[in-house]
A protein has these predicted regions:
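Acidic, metal-coordinating helix/loop segments flanking the phosphotransfer/catalytic sites
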Residues: 31-49
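Two-component/phosphorelay signaling modules centered on CheY-like receiver
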Residues: 10-30
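Short amphipathic alpha-helix used as the core "switch/output" element in two-component signaling
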Residues: 40, 62-73
Length: 119
């Protein structure tokens, strides 16, 4: 499984990668701090899952997810962020978004979220 993780800060990506590696060993995890570069990567490569920070520079997480799903309609996609970052998305999340994860990431929460979505 190929997982694309996108966030402004490398520390967030490292934490997410650590938890994803524990939950889904053997998955290839691609980290990117630039949403536009992540979109370019997804346009040129097959990805199975995208975790995108809601509040990013140049392009927000929802815009990135919509861009990726245009190329890969079956990709599973998750917005990540703090409760405050995600407050604008509660109750109004686009059908493009599979789910939402809040910081701090907890292995059990990630595992339950992936299982709930058939992954």
């Amino acid at each position: 499984m190929k997982i694309l993780t996108v966030a402004n800060h490398i520390a967030i990506l490292e934490e997410l990668e650590k938890e994803l590696s524990a939950v889904s060993p053997g998955s290839e995890i691609i980290r990117e701090t630039d949403a536009l570069m992540a979109g370019k990567y997804a346009f040129n490569h097959e990805v199975d899952i995208v975790f995108a920070e809601a509040d990013m520079k140049r392009m927000n997480g929802l815009q990135l997810i919509q861009f990726v799903r245009h190329k890969h309609p079956d990709v599973k996609s998750f917005l990540i962020g703090t409760d405050e970052d995600l407050s604008g998305f509660w109750g109004g999340v686009s059908e493009d978004v599979t789910g939402i994860l809040t910081y701090p990431f907890i292995k059990k929460t990630i595992r339950d979220t992936l299982r709930k979505n058939g992954l």
